[in-house]
Each structure stands twice: as C-alpha cells, then as structure tokens.
Design a protein with these regions (language model features):
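Cytoplasmic juxtamembrane interface segments
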Residues: 1-11, 129-137, 227
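N-terminal first transmembrane alpha-helix
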Residues: 1-116
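Cytosolic/matrix-facing juxtamembrane and C-terminal tails of multi-pass cellular membrane proteins
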Residues: 1-17, 234-330
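Transmembrane alpha-helical segments and their cytosolic interface motifs
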Residues: 7-27, 163-226
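Hydrophobic alpha-helical transmembrane segments
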Residues: 48-66, 210-231
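Hydrophobic alpha-helical membrane-associated segments
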Residues: 62-73, 230, 234-245
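Juxtamembrane/interfacial segments around transmembrane helices
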Residues: 65-72, 109-119, 251, 255-257, ...
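Membrane-proximal, non-transmembrane interface segments of integral membrane proteins
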Residues: 79-201
C-alpha cells in the first residue's frame, strides 16, 4: 500500500498540478457550486458544522482526494481531448466548415500585409508574419479545422521542411536526450498548454452540463443562463490562451530539433552527415524505414513460399491442407 502511495505521489509534480490537478479542482468546485444552487446553501452549512473532528478530517481528505482522482482521469484521456481541440475527431461537415474559416483567417493575414498603410506597414507586416509563422502551416493543404490544430500542423511542418524529420515520430526519441535546461523549458511549456486546454474543456462542460442541470433539472433558468455564459466565456478565454501558449511551446520544440537532433543519431551509432542535403536524406530514409515497420501490410511472400514447399515436398507431419478444387463455388 505504501509503495502504491509513493508511486502516486511521485507523479504529482508541479507540471502535473498545472496540467491536470488545477483543472480538476476547478471542475469539482464548479460542480459543487451548481449542486448547491439546486439545493439549499444553509443545509450544507448546517451539515458541515454538525460533523465531529474525525468526520471533518475525512471530508477534508475527500476534498483533496477526489480532485486528484479526476486529475489522473484527465491525464488518462489527454489524447482524446487533444484530438478534439486539434479538430481531427470532428464530424466531417464541421471539420470542412472549420477548414474554410481557418483558410479565410490565413488569407486575412496575407491581406493585412498587402493593404496596410505605408506608415503602419512594418508593424502590420511583423504582426501578420508572426501569425503566419507560428500559427499556420505554410501549405494550404495542411490547414486544420481549428486554431490549435494549425499550431500543431505548423509544428510538424517546420521539422519536416527544415530537417526532413517527422515531428511526431521523432519527438519521443529526442525528448529523453535533451539536456536538463531545454527539457525543463519544453516540458513546462507543454504543461502550460495542456492545463489551459483542460480548463477550456472543463469550462465548456460545466457551462453546458450545468445549464442543463439547473434549467431542466431545477427549473432555475436565470441561473442556468448565467452558468452557460460564464462557462463558455471561460472556455473561450482558456482556448485562446492555449493557442498562444501552444505556439510558444512549438518554438521551443523547433529549437530542440535544431540544436539536439544529432543526439539521436549518436545514440543509434550513426555518423552525422557532413551537409544538410545528406542529413535530410538520412532522416527521411530512417523515417521511412520506421513507418514501414510500423504499418507494414501483411506479406503474401511467406504464404506463397509455404504453398510452394507443400506442393514440392508434401505437407509436414500433422499439417493439414485444403483441396481448393473440391471447395464449393458461388
């Protein structure tokens, strides 16, 4: 039991608190407030004051333990939440609508450069350039349905165009090799982004779920409207902050690949190529080999060799064969 508690506490570091525990506390607090709105505040006050010392300790422990359990649940489902904000799990009509909106936003950034007045031109050029550089992929074919999806597409496109590296394939192999300062910076930036995305998700869930609970369940339509507005505004603010934070995290990941990608080659016992073209070709070849091993189609060569061996030497002892000439035909 104590070893299990030690394992759990080892996972609760500052990054875990930022990414998952604080959003879980917000979720539990918001849910508790809405539940209290459906009942009587005085009832909960009287009930809490009626508890003895041991019961109050148990209550306090539960108030800490329940958000922690929810935090670990958020960590377990972080990938579906991430895919939702990237837009890859959206229904096709919604995704197509989102891509059209993002294409217009990208075009507007270009138009800002072309149509700005001469005296303000440099300011708008810098602003539009930062938007295009950090928040959109260069290729229009890679535009995603959401702002956050385009930040991740930009992240992937940079490493591919600069070094021939597939970001998602090689980042798990690079991250353990980074020196402590760079590893700490990138992990902190990613934790901040994850925490803001979780807060956005929880804000939307509290707004929609709380409004339904208060309105349909309790008939408190005024309170339901307030909860809906507050929840959705919180979700929108946290999402926009997550997009900006994700772009900042992307800049540090770009720097990590620029500075330390050769550590992977050294770990594999490979020589670092002497020029950029050769290095790009090497990374592309390594990526191709890894993807071929991961997604290799079932090979028919082994089955063909086995069939030829049986036809020449007969089946092995105990091996069953099927005479296809006697099989029924449709």
């Amino acid at each position: 039991m104590f070893s299990a508690l030690t394992d759990i506490t080892d996972q609760i570091d500052p990054k875990f608190v930022i990414s998952y525990w604080i959003p879980a506390v917000v979720a539990m607090s918001g849910g508790g407030m809405m539940w209290s709105m459906m009942t009587d505040f005085d009832f909960w006050d009287v009930w809490a004051n009626s508890l003895d010392g041991v019961e109050q300790i148990v209550l306090a422990g539960s108030m800490v333990g329940m958000p922690t359990i929810l935090a670990f649940f958020l960590k377990a489902v972080r990938r579906p939440i991430l895919m939702l904000f990237m837009g890859t799990s959206l229904p096709r009509p919604v995704a197509e609508w989102g891509i059209r909106r993002q294409m217009r936003a990208k075009d507007n950034a270009y138009q800002m450069i072309l149509t700005s007045e001469e005296q303000d031109r440099q300011f708008f050029i810098n602003k539009a350039h930062q938007t295009l550089e950090r928040r959109f992929p260069e290729s229009s074919a890679r535009v995603m349905p959401t702002r956050f999806g385009n930040v991740t597409a930009n992240l992937e496109e940079y490493t591919r165009s600069m070094h021939g590296i597939d970001h998602w394939l090689w980042w798990p192999r690079l991250a353990p090799l980074l020196p402590e300062p760079m590893a700490e910076i990138t992990a902190t930036e990613v934790a901040n982004t994850t925490g803001l995305l979780n807060l956005s998700f929880i804000g939307a869930a509290l707004g929609l779920g709380g409004a339904a609970m208060l309105g349909l369940g309790g008939g408190l339509w005024t309170a339901a409207l307030k909860v809906l507005v507050v929840g959705l505004v919180l979700a929108w603010i946290c999402y926009r902050m997550a997009v900006a934070q994700g772009a900042e995290a992307g800049r540090h990941m770009h720097a990590a690949f620029d500075l330390y990608r050769h550590e992977i080659l050294k770990q594999w016992g490979l020589d670092v190529p002497g020029n950029r073209e050769a290095e790009t070709a090497l990374w592309e070849d390594l990526s191709r080999q890894m993807l071929d091993r991961s997604f290799r189609a079932p090979s028919t060569s082994a089955a063909a060799n086995t069939a030829a061996d049986i036809a020449q030497n007969g089946p092995a002892p105990g091996q069953k064969t099927v005479d296809v000439s006697r099989q029924p035909t449709s």
